[in-house]
Amino acid sequence: MTVTQQAFKQSLAQFASGVTVVTTMHAGHRQGLTVSAFNSVSLSPPLVSICVDCKLDVHAAICASGVFAVNLLAQQQLEYGMRFAGMVAGLTDRFEGVDTLTAITGSPLLPNTLAWLDCRVWQVYAGGDHSIIVGEVLATECGAGLAPLIYHNRNWGRIAAIDAGNAAPPGSPGASTEN
């Protein structure tokens, strides 16, 4: 059975994800990209992974500079998510008007994020039309306990709290049978 790109994308769109902006600095130029393909990899050493399209300038900049930062967006930072995804019409410099901080690696850090992780490229793996870039976390900082920005089914969203204290285990009396 062959999986079409459309079916593959539709299935993956069902997975809710946090939203990050990955940034780097190379040859005096800031680069940034909205990324939802972000994961923790290891605690010792502290490693994370991002997946970036091989055709993008930011991919080349990360590989050439050997550094990147991951900025975890709060729900109030939808504009950053859209801006760095290239969804703001007429915007050529995604950093225009954004007062960034500078990480120890030189990567730009967005203000007031949930957290940021400053990374050195540990390893780059081929992954089809993307690279799986593993970074060693050199520095990190958490923000002020805000709620995360979420991306699900090609829509931006936020978390709605569920009262887990009233949840019944699957298969027990009172458990939901809805799909």
Task: Tell me the role of every PLM-derived stretch.
Residues M1-N179:
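Basic, polyanion-binding surface patches
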